[in-house]
UniProtKB/Swiss-Prot annotation:
UniProt keyword Aminoacyl-tRNA synthetase present: no
Gene this chain is encoded by: omd
GO cellular component, one term: INTAC complex
Subcellular location: Nucleus membrane; Nucleus; Cytoplasm
Entry-linked InterPro entries: INTS5, INTS5_C, INTS5_N
Protein's job: Component of the integrator complex, a multiprotein complex that terminates RNA polymerase II (Pol II) transcription in the promoter-proximal region of genes. The integrator complex provides a quality checkpoint during transcription elongation by driving premature transcription termination of transcripts that are unfavorably configured for transcriptional elongation: the complex terminates transcription by (1) catalyzing dephosphorylation of the C-terminal domain (CTD) of Pol II subunit Polr2A/Rbp1 and Spt5, and (2) degrading the exiting nascent RNA transcript via endonuclease activity.
MF annotations from Gene Ontology: DNA binding
Record-given protein name: Integrator complex subunit 5
Gene Ontology process terms (BP): negative regulation of BMP signaling pathway; positive regulation of gene expression; positive regulation of neuron differentiation; RNA polymerase II transcription initiation surveillance; snRNA 3'-end processing
Membrane topology: Multi-pass membrane protein
Keyword Translocase in record: no
Start-end of Basic and acidic residues biased regions: 571-583
Amino acid sequence: MLRQNLLDQLKHFIETVSNGHSCPQLLTSPNLIKLALGFLEELPATRDIVFEYFALLAEISVQLYVSPEMADPKTGMPVSQVKLAGNRQQQQRAPEYEAFNLVKTALQSLVWKGPPAWSPLIANWSLELVAKLSDKYTQRRMTITASCNYWLECSAMHGLMTLINSCFRKLTQPEEEACVEIMLNAFHRFPMTFDWIVARLGGCFPYKIIMQILQCGIKRFVDDYRCHLDSEAGILDYMTSCHEQHLRAAFREMLREGFAPKKPLDVAVVPFLLITTNYSDTILQSLVNVLVEIYTEDMCEVIVQKAPLWLSNKMFAGMQPTLNNAVLRLNERGATLLLTAAKMAEKYVWCQDFLDNSMQELEQWVLNQRNFPLLADLAYEETKYMLWKSCLSTNLFEQQTAVRLLLVVSSQHPNIYYQTISQLLKKSYAQNPNGIGALIRLLGGQSGMVNFPGFTPGFKMVLEDITLDVQVNNRLPVPPGTPTEAFNTFSNLNILARMHKSKNVAPYIKAQHLNQALNECLPKILQIFDCTVNKLVLRIDRDAAERIADKFRAQQSKNSNNNNELCNGKDYGKRTKLEPGEDKVDDEDATRMRLAHLIVDLLNNIEAGSRTTVLRTPLVLKLATLSVKYFFVGLTEKTVIRRAAASHRSYTLLQRQCSARKIARTVCLRELVERALFYHGHLLGQLEVYQLDELEIPEHEHLILQNLHTSSGANSNRSVLHSGIIGRGLRPVLPPSERNCDAEKQALYLKALNACCADLEKPNNVEGYSLVSLLLVELVSTDVMYNGLPFPDEEFTRVTMERDMLIRRAFINSPVLWAVLGLIAGHRPALCYSSVLLRALCATCLHHWRGKNVNRFQPTAANDELMLCTKKMLQLLAMSQLIPPPLTNLHLIIEHFESAEIALLLRECIWNYLKDHVPSPALFHVDNNGLHWRNTNTQLAKVPPQYVDPLRHLMQRKLSTLGPHYHQMFIMGELMEGDSEPDPTARLQIVEID
């Protein structure tokens, strides 16, 4: 009975399906669907009929999906039936559209819960059905992504794809191979419409599908090289999004076969892969990634050997323009590919052609302001560092390629341009001089671009980094002698500045732009210069203090009778010959010194402080102060040549500033004089005085312990009147000063003063020297009163005796004062403004010679300090024409007179003459050459006899000794009276007082 019932139901099912083609409502009846599903379990022989019915249901659903009524009137895209609610006809079609969902649910349950044999059967049926429906109802060619989005919106197609995916998970290895074969066969039959199915289902067997697709493409390519590979490329492109590693593995395997061909198809592997990259940027990117990973130098030789085989393919022979364009489509490894080709360009001409074509097209895209994927690759941090490294390469092709790529990316990312300038400026090009060419080419910018970023921010960036590095004293430890980044930067900037001055950078860098950029960075340069020079100055002062302290301790040890008590049984305060870390300090100081020299060279090359540059007043003052500090730092160089070189650098810097601005001249002169007298006098032979702490009380010593050093002795004159220190013993006997007046350093110092005072436009201008004279009065004289030009009566010197003695002490301690006065004396009438100093010297010498008259038999040594002071003073007066002939020769014969006679001459001849003839600039007139001159040979300027007769009478007593001088001074002078006034033709610029 049950058997008969099944047969009746089968008959009814066949009749209904046969007669229901014109009535979809009848075919999509839920009862009929349930009846068909029952046949699968109860009547396996009806399986083919049932699956045909299921295919019919799927086709009905697809027909409803692609019908015009299912299209959105606004977008034209199909709309899911279940989402429609306004159209009655569409509402009636909804059950038919969703009918296949019942089939999908039942078949999926059968796959998961039924026998394993159902999985391959349902999978094969679903693949065939999807292929037929897709091919039949595809109305236009679409991309794989668009096809997936289009068909997966259809309920039936989505259900079939779900079934296939479920079946694939239950298949065994042989069954998988069979399903893949069916899928590829369907792809061969429907290559234009089945590609999206392969791409969608390829995730189940990614590597197999990818390899099979590639093999199919190679076969088609070998049969017809003009064939289109859109489907194959589309499948690979779609699968790359989730299975890129499998695609790379497939490419790696195929390239291995292509570079070592064993089969006829292997020869076409490389041309096929390169052709495939034209269809998809994703495939191109994956292939390039694989090539970069497996590339070796040996592979290059293989490529050259196999190239004739590949060129036999007509399409590959003419695809170089396509390859050039391919580089611009890379999101990654594009720069690596170009640099690799650049490294090979020296050996292979085709690499040069590839580079030229690629870079020209790349730059053309930039000029046209077109965006391309390679820009993203160039902007990556890793790529940026790789390009910076290539800029330092000795391979010129690699270097210039890296520079051009950096210029390309800099047009869109200015920060990379600034960072690149900063990095290249910090590098040393001593071993690779051609490396500076990359920096020069980079500063030239991208030709043809109007709004290309300037390089001034790049200079400021590197100077900011150097400022931090200099301030923290080299954050990273470096081996001794290694050039620092600061040294390299200023060395490179000097090279650029010198090229700018010699007009050798014209093809690349606009000279005015370079000079303007460096002058804009002047505040940063001065900040670095300030930090560097100040550290050197501190080191100089510290060394001087330690040297003085060592000398004092050594003498103290010799003079003390109780050395052990003084030092508390220890070598207190003594330094070892080489303290730990002293070598490191010396290396750091040497590095700073070299850096200071480079900075000054740069300032001279860019003509910092000249009239053509506009500087704010604080910068002018800072530059002037640092220039003077650098001069004194340069005097500490170890050799004469280095000192001279440093001094000449400072002369150029000082002279340019002082000629341009009066405020700079004032500051420079004040700093030069003040530092020579109070801060760095030890460099110029100044007497070094140790600041002695006589009590030497320890900082944490209690008062009760301090009192133990003292005791109450007998109240006698021998215990009360003593020359020692209570509790410390006798004062040490200091040795006589052993001053070494370095003539070389004094000459350099005088040249520095002369550089500040000299006016190139007005050579005879003495304004600067007059300013030095006034500064000496301000800094040496301790009293603001009685600093005028006139000489008072000799009795008045008792009022200013203390000040005069202090001024005399200043000349004793600082011998350079004599040299400075000698320089001033040669530029008349500047010495007149130092009248108070001359008055103090004359007064003290007069009183001292008068005091020596107490013991008239005491001989005067030739090098006695008083005699030397007197001779120098008289020589200054003669050079400056403040005293007339024959008194101008007095310094030559003064040593032949006794103390009383010298005192007489100083009072009657010198002091009285200067008292009656005030040393004023009004005494001098300007001759035709612009020189200030005092004519003393005319009748009106004849010296009255009261100033000359004392000298005449004293010389007459000693004619045996002073006869030649007497003849020259008096007899010859009287014979020459009435002659024309002398015509001075030269002037002493630097005069050293003997």
